[in-house]
Amino acid sequence: MRAILIDWLVEVHYKFHLRDETLYQTVFIIDSYLSAFPILRAKLQLLGVAALFISCKQQEIYYPQIYELIDITDGAYVKEELVEMENHILKILKFNIVSPTAIEFYNIISKAFNFDTKQYFLGKYFMESSLIDYQMIKYSASVIGVSCAYVVMKFCGINNYKCLYSKNVVKEEIPQKVIKEAAREICHLVKNLSNSTLKAVRDKYSLPQFLNVAQYCEQN
């Protein structure tokens, strides 16, 4: 059910034209809450919307209002339920709702290695694909960011990928073995997307504005 929720949130995030960081913080809040507090399946979408609302307040200048978030749930919840869930999340997490995200590390790397636009979007495609699978939370945000950059560099034939093993890029020395292991899992996830019922990430990155990198990836 978590995978279905995150897939839906990717679609919602795109619909409202929100910042990348907002999506990653939303997923961080959801996973932190789920690890600390049991929740009924019927309330999972409410958790997702409330987490998105909290993230928007942190990351965005202009963001969806409560009535808009209620609308995207097709009226499954009312305003009072959303506010109550928002307060409960903050209480359970003790306002610890911000953490470094994979996109932040990836942005540092993409600039350091002068990724072109297609390479940059490829990495974003890989990262958002990794959000769907709960098993990927065993890796830190820095590992995901570096590993996605590693996959991009290998995929595109950028030979200086070995520089990623140095702590000079992200101020953290990540073992080569860990990067390669995470990269293999990311490749496996992306490969399986074409046959998955969870389509939001693949559909998003099949759009011209993202240079159709999902299709480019499948064709190469």
Question: What do the PLM-derived regions correspond to, one by one?
Answer:
Residues 1-49, 53-220:
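Acidic, serine/threonine-rich low-complexity regulatory regions at protein termini
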